[in-house]
Amino acid sequence: MPLFATPFAQLDLVRQPEQDGEPLQAFDAADEYLLNQLHERGVTAQCRVLVLNDAFGALAASLAPHVQVTSSGDSHLGFLALRKNLARNGLDLGSVRFVPASETAVGPFDHVLVKVPKTLALLEEQLIRLHGQLAPGAQVVAAGMVKHLPRAAGDLLERYIGPMHASLAVKKARLLIAEAAERPQPRSPYPTRYRLEQPPLTLLNHANVFCREGLDIGTRAFLPHLPRSLGALRAADLGCGNGVLGIAYALLNPQAELALVDESYMAVQSARENWRAALGERPATFRADDGLAGQAAGSLDLVLCNPPFHQQQVVGDFLAWRMFLQARDALAAGGELWIVGNRHLGYHAKLKRLFRGVEQVAANPKFVILKAGK
């Protein structure tokens, strides 16, 4: 892979999770454009720079030796990538302060560099949280590849930050440059809530939660077929989102021990709040993690999973395959992985390569529910 070369540094960067023969770079032309623009503007060692949504740490690692850097995002994989790339390039792990997107990064900041996320609700919440955190004369610069940069991103900068103009495109990347101006204290529209009829739950969803306006159709297909009356099993909701699968399973299985795990900090926060609303002080574990990478081998009896099929703009089954591998390792002998997936993804064949037995629990024209036994 080529080095990421800017006026600030030349770095050897990797994506997270790493794949053998990874065809994709851990940076893009929008990262390069952001850093070139900041260098032209001029920075000193005293400059306080906030980086938002730095997918694999390219921005923060480049700036770490030169300015005071805070990085914030909603991906735990992004945090792991930042740490790995700092270490890989001989940089101090403490040179970048990381703040999960579920919390507010406290300034004041002189410069804010933003990679525009796929979910504009996350961008909106991040811009709202910048209120009161910008130094006088601060500039907020958002960037993305032109094909992934919606007009609405500029509208959000105008609304919450100040006057905005778009740059010319360079290497198919564009900047949206906003000058901080007085704005009234905004009211955030997040979290959102929706009502589920069965089981009867009101579910809270922070800004970056998948399908925050209503239950996704895969989970809707899965819910009626969750296993029940299984006793005191150790179970995990892998890729838990707002926690609906884990909560519904816990209601059906009062003795079960649950761990709700997601790589999104906002998802884990949503799951924690929804669990408390539905189940009070019943114990459970909530963890932002790289799937079940932090789970002891053989420590689970059941894993529930509605696997994702994209990472940022990249679509594929590599994340699902990795989750299946992690589930197999975390399950005890006789344990089961239950999943829902689109029919066309062929998860049945993939699971047969990892588990001793795979059964179809239910199906409809779009989705299939499978259980795989270890």
UniProtKB/Swiss-Prot annotation:
EC identifiers of the protein:
2.1.1.174
Entry keyword Zinc-finger: no
Which GO MF term does the entry hold, naming one?
A: 23S rRNA (guanine(1835)-N(2))-methyltransferase activity
In terms of CDD domains, this protein maps to: AdoMet_MTases
Q: Does the keyword Magnesium apply?
A: no
Q: Which UniProt keywords apply?
A: Cytoplasm, Methyltransferase, rRNA processing, S-adenosyl-L-methionine, Transferase
Signal sequence interval, chain numbering: none
Location of the protein in the cell: Cytoplasm
Q: What class of enzyme is it?
A: transferase
Question: Which GO BP terms, alphabetically?
Answer: rRNA base methylation
One GO cellular component term? cytoplasm
InterPro entries xref list: DNA_methylase_N6_adenine_CS, rRNA_m2G-MeTrfase_RlmG, RsmC/RlmG, SAM-dependent_MTases_sf, Small_mtfrase_dom
Catalysed reactions, as listed in the record: guanosine(1835) in 23S rRNA + S-adenosyl-L-methionine = N(2)-methylguanosine(1835) in 23S rRNA + S-adenosyl-L-homocysteine + H(+)
On the tree of life, the source organism's domain of life is Bacteria
Pfam families per the record? Answer: MTS (PF05175)
PANTHER family noted in UniProt: RIBOSOMAL RNA LARGE SUBUNIT METHYLTRANSFERASE G, RIBOSOMAL RNA SMALL SUBUNIT METHYLTRANSFERASE C
Family in the record: Belongs to the methyltransferase superfamily. RlmG family.
Its biological purpose: Specifically methylates the guanine in position 1835 (m2G1835) of 23S rRNA.
Q: What is this protein called?
A: Ribosomal RNA large subunit methyltransferase G
